[in-house]
Amino acid sequence: MTDVHLMGTVHCTKVCWDIMKEQEYGRIVVTSSSSGLYGNFGQTNYGAAKMGVIGMMNTLAQEGAKYNVKINALAPTAGTRMTEGLIDEKAFALLTPETVTPAVLYLVSEDAPTRTILAAGAGSFAVAKIVETEGMWLPEAEQTPEGIAANWTQISEGGERALQAGYEQGIKMVGQAAKGLGLETG
């Protein structure tokens, strides 16, 4: 499963990556899935592979930015052999490839965004985002499982934002610690 859905995506992307960088233009659309974004019973390996594609997209979006190479992910909802018989026939009939095609065409357009997960199906479109709460810093004495449990509401709710790079999480957390400890940081 990972060989096809994750490594297949890696290999296809690698073939065109240097060409797009050299010409300073490129658009890549990878395929993810709601099974990767949200989970789906019985599809652990498929979901893991499809979420791995998102990690690849996030990193390549940073690497391709200065070359005008944009990469996005499509999370399609479509009637397929995998979904046939699992959903109502009328609903299945709405989930045609034609209702997903406009999303792909937009993601490869000159004005496409980058690092975006575009969900599409049955003529509906939405952007899926990975967000992190503001969270909070805990004094050393409270840095325990019990301290986390006691502060769970503040840790888990509020201030959701989509981080643009992994280092932003570290900067945020160090900033919270410095503030909590009354330290000046540069």
Predicted regions and their residues:
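Catalytic Tyr-X3-Lys loop
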Residues: 1-10, 25, 29, 53
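Residue(s) in the substrate-gating loop at a strand-loop-helix junction
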Residues: 33
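Active-site helix of classical SDR
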Residues: 13, 49
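Flexible, glycine-rich beta-alpha linker
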Residues: 69-88
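Active-site loop-to-helix junction immediately N-terminal to the catalytic Tyr of the SDR YXXXK motif
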Residues: 39-47, 87
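Active-site-adjacent segment of SDR/Rossmann-fold oxidoreductases
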Residues: 19-20, 38, 54, 59-70, ...
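Conserved catalytic-site region of short-chain dehydrogenase/reductase
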Residues: 36-38, 80
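C-terminal helical subdomain
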Residues: 73, 91-183
